[in-house]
Amino acid sequence: MSNQIYSARYSGVDVYEFIHSTGSIMKRKKDDWVNATHILKAANFAKAKRTRILEKEVLKETHEKVQGGFGKYQGTWVPLNIAKQLAEKFSVYDQLKPLFDFTQTDGSASPPPAPKHHHASKVDRKKAIRSASTSAIMETKRNNKKAEENQFQSSKILGNPTAAPRKRGRPVGSTRGSRRKLGVNLQRSQSDMGFPRPAIPNSSISTTQLPSIRSTMGPQSPTLGILEEERHDSRQQQPQQNNSAQFKEIDLEDGLSSDVEPSQQLQQVFNQNTGFVPQQQSSLIQTQQTESMATSVSSSPSLPTSPGDFADSNPFEERFPGGGTSPIISMIPRYPVTSRPQTSDINDKVNKYLSKLVDYFISNEMKSNKSLPQVLLHPPPHSAPYIDAPIDPELHTAFHWACSMGNLPIAEALYEAGTSIRSTNSQGQTPLMRSSLFHNSYTRRTFPRIFQLLHETVFDIDSQSQTVIHHIVKRKSTTPSAVYYLDVVLSKIKDFSPQYRIELLLNTQDKNGDTALHIASKNGDVVFFNTLVKMGALTTISNKEGLTANEIMNQQYEQMMIQNGTNQHVNSSNTDLNIHVNTNNIETKNDVNSMVIMSPVSPSDYITYPSQIATNISRNIPNVVNSMKQMASIYNDLHEQHDNEIKSLQKTLKSISKTKIQVSLKTLEVLKESSKDENGEAQTNDDFEILSRLQEQNTKKLRKRLIRYKRLIKQKLEYRQTVLLNKLIEDETQATTNNTVEKDNNTLERLELAQELTMLQLQRKNKLSSLVKKFEDNAKIHKYRRIIREGTEMNIEEVDSSLDVILQTLIANNNKNKGAEQIITISNANSHA
């Protein structure tokens, strides 16, 4: 077995390496320490099991953990005796005995070096790959060159001496990296970019799915893949390039393998779609485009623009005069009418479906909310991009109509069919914008789901650079649907967008420089104004007129105050004026001109200042008033609580008095019994003396108790009032420190205020004393209760609740007595007569 032991050096350490079926087992030459991890590997333990064994049995002994360096040398090293014990325990001692027993005597030959284990480095792999790729490229170049020579010779034989050798590849300046970079940019929409609006040229919008190229070339054309991949790159070419542009050798890894050059007709279509116009053909193409635009009305039935005539179509420039930033334009073919494909089967199916959809939208079934035809819920498969064709003169798509109508089933069906959520009408408005302009999604309660489908377009802008927030705010907060839409948008946008993007959306300026906050200010809309400010809209942005939202709101407030002052004089004679009061504002509608006037709840709702802090303080005045009202309510509750406590104390005093009287009576009875002599005669003089003494003692005790109770009541009242006064002083102090108040150094005024404060304190003490006296002075009332108790045989506790009944009984008895007296008087008079 000694032939299995070798010499090796790992991480600068000389070791003996024993070759085992599970791997190498190492022992250090300098101290005969053995790698315990290798022993556990020889015992066929898994890594997790090895770790547990090392922790329980090895690490508590003498050991050395080696981490880093050569991988095979790493592990937990232990002395030879511990290694032998470990091997014996796990039944591998016999297998590793040659390594344990091996010793090298002085002068003896060292074991042979361990066999080399080849580990290919990264440099070697790169060199191998580079050499293989170079050889493959050179071989491909030689094959391509031979094929070109053969093709050139065949062209001469066929009688085409001018045919140039064809080269495979893309024009100079177009690389695979540039195409990839462009592809990334094309996938980014306006909603993925920050504001301001990026300048994306129309020629850079992807049109890789256009039916024109596919149907024109057909499946037999071998250059379709080249054109579709090179279309973006060729847009970077200069128009001055010749039609026979210079080509360079193509990289084999880009996947393009066609050696066929595009035909002249196909090259012309390609140049027209990509904007690559050679100098020799520029005038010809312009002439063809002019002729095609003149005959574009009936040239293609694939792009309908109205529900009545789906066969009508216009050139792209006429169909989308204003288009916004949404990339729906990329889904509509960008080519002149002459190069449009002929009608296909899928085109006809989509046109029929759109026709049925328009008929349903304008029918009474839609208005009456009848059951939806099932055929409308199943658009033709593979209908994109035909499904995004305009269906009315304003270039709305079917998806625009479905979202505007709030018809969620149709909207979801079109969404699943692949319709573009960023399709725009003639004003550049997206389906989300159109949905927010009507109340249908509000009445049907479908706007949250529609917004969920279209949430990616919430940052898109139309041709006027207005967002969906602009469109909602223009409808004013007096419209319930507008309030509902804004609440949904602002609440759900937080789920997928950071705060800075929300603020960018709210502060987006249109072509007039107006943000949504400017529009709310122009409308005098306090509700929307405050909502947008709370969400992060800035009040300091100036529009093109140089006005901020604050300034516009102040102007609206001034006009409102003037108009309200005029209306107070005219209101008595104006019978056509209807006033509708809302919870937050007053809406005044004039039946003559439908003029809407919003008057504020208070001036602080409208007044704004150049300082944002001053504006916030002004608007917090209602909060201060509400806090004072809450404080008054709390004080009132405490007052009622104190009254209840005082009443309970009075009841306690009454019960104590009653007990005192009963005890006194019992005491007198006992004293009378004990003061009788043997003959049963009472000693009256002694009785009176004893009774008087007892009464004096009881009176003194009761007075002391009364004084103590009075003191307790007064202390409680003073303590509660002190707490309230301290709280009021603290609130006033905080309010004084928060608001910058000029210091008044007028000593005389301070003295007057101090004198007034002293008077108020004295008044408070006097009122407190009078309040305690009122509770104390109940002797007469108690006597009245005792009189009633003696006359009615009722308990004193029941007297207060029975006063009304007793009074009515006495009145009734009095009336009966008077009637009896009158009867007696009459009978006496008759008897005398």
Curated annotation (Swiss-Prot):
PTM sites of type Phosphoserine: 110, 326, 330, 827
ANK repeats mapped onto the chain: 394-423, 512-541
Predominant location category: nucleus
Modified residues (Phosphothreonine): 325
SMART domains for this protein: ANK, KilA-N
Biased composition (Basic residues): 115-129
GO cellular component terms given for this protein: MBF transcription complex; nucleus; SBF transcription complex
Keywords for the protein's UniProt record, in alphabetical order: Activator, ANK repeat, DNA-binding, Nucleus, Phosphoprotein, Repeat, Transcription, Transcription regulation
Annotated segments matching region Disordered: 104-223, 280-329
Example GO biological process: G1/S transition of mitotic cell cycle
Annotation: DNA-binding region: 36-57
Bias (Low complexity): 280-307
Misc. comment: Present with 521 molecules/cell in log phase SD medium.
Function: Binds to MCB elements (Mlu I cell cycle box) found in the promoter of most DNA synthesis genes. Transcriptional activation by MBF has an important role in the transition from G1 to S phase. It may have a dual role in that it behaves as an activator of transcription at the G1-S boundary and as a repressor during other stages of the cell cycle.
UniProt subunit comment: Component of the transcription complex MCB-binding factor (MBF) composed of SWI6 and MBP1. Interacts with MSA1.
Protein name according to UniProt: Transcription factor MBP1
Organism for this UniProt entry: Saccharomyces cerevisiae (strain ATCC 204508 / S288c) (Baker's yeast)
